[in-house]
Amino acid sequence: MPSEILVKILSYLDAVTLVCIGCVSRRFYHLADDNLIWVRKYAAAFRSKRSRWKATSVEETATSLSLLSVWDKEDGYWKKEYITKQISSVRAALTNSLSPVKRRTSLPSKTKESLRISGLGWTIILREASGKEHIMQHSNLSVNDNSVTVFWHDKNWPHVDTLSTLDLYGATPIFMEQYKGPNTSCPRWLSLIEKYDLSNLRKSAMIGCDRHVRVFCVNPGLLVGLWQENGGLAFVMANIHSHGLFERSIMGSDTIPYTLPPDTTFVDNYPDSMTFYGDKGFQLHIDIHGSKTYFLCSTFHNLFCRRAGINNGYVKFLMINLKNNREHLPLVGKVGLEWRTDCLNGRIESCIVVDMTLLDEDKKPIWYVSSPVCLRSACLPDFPQPAYSFEYMDSVGGVCADLGWFENTDEYFIVRLDIYLSVAKLQQWFGRQ
């Protein structure tokens, strides 16, 4: 069929169908890029809301003359302009939906609703050393109070020894109003969240296993499961904290991640006898879960850091004291990390996920993390019960905790909990030197 007739037919299609039909073949790709088609769709879709009067003959003549300049642009110019404008409108709509926050944690309160409305999903691109790419949309996810846990599992994974990197992206439908389901096949744009190096995965810290899989943690927040039988990929799990979740998932590009703008609070100098920073105290919210099942949700108020508590560039917050039984907190339920694939599922008893949000005196998140951690045997002096510990540390902050196992109640209790925050982060946050 002549190209002129095909272009005429394509002009009657909506924008979504046009984008999809451009993926059929090279010929349709070029035909679906026709500038005249897209400039008309652009004018119809993004016409100024103030221009509601009927066009006069003079305006119609001016419009027809402006269409003549369409041919001065390269093929696909107006298609790119249309999609860029559409992405901007979707970003604006999603940003407006995130304004309500929880009073307790200052994190978005309508995460589930925003996910449902936007159709936002997450995609990983596995790259082999040869350059070959494997693109996978998420299989399922769990929306937690302060984080999102995203799962990928498949029967046809590439061999783990051939992989060099894993890139995590937010994937948002370009035409949000037509496609609201996260698993719907539709045109999406990608926002890079994090890059992970998988070239030495087996040398990474193994944080748990059961009879089917071994799990390895790749910071920040990525868990990779390998089959015990053949060492192949079983599943991938990513833990993404809710603070800045949507911004990082929709505002970046496919090559550059979005960086949250710095939020500095300037305070007066305090003498050494008073608190190091702030006069109202920090607040910590901590959740411990197994990707779906919660074991602990707790908030600590009025936390202060003093100059005497600085060691190795970190300030220490003492949350729970081993010697004070009244401060000890139980983990409710059977502790462990749940995992699943297309054919099997299980639970790794030595692995849990910790979500932490440290707020300053104005309830702004100063440090936040969502990461799997490993429960390891520990020895606590003057503590008769079996003891375990877990820890997490990055350049900004960290956590160290000791747990006791009480056989009479079949429960873990957190008997010591310390939080660390870098002095450099505090100085940057409060504008101090």
From Swiss-Prot:
GO terms for cellular component: SCF ubiquitin ligase complex. InterPro entries: F-box-like_dom_sf, F-box_dom. This is F-box only protein 15. Expressed in testis. It comes from the Eukaryota. Substrate-recognition component of the SCF (SKP1-CUL1-F-box protein)-type E3 ubiquitin ligase complex. SUPFAM superfamilies: F-box domain. The gene is Fbxo15. Keywords: Ubl conjugation pathway. Gene3D superfamilies: 1.20.1280.50. Directly interacts with SKP1 and CUL1. Residues 1-41 form the F-box domain. It comes from Mus musculus.
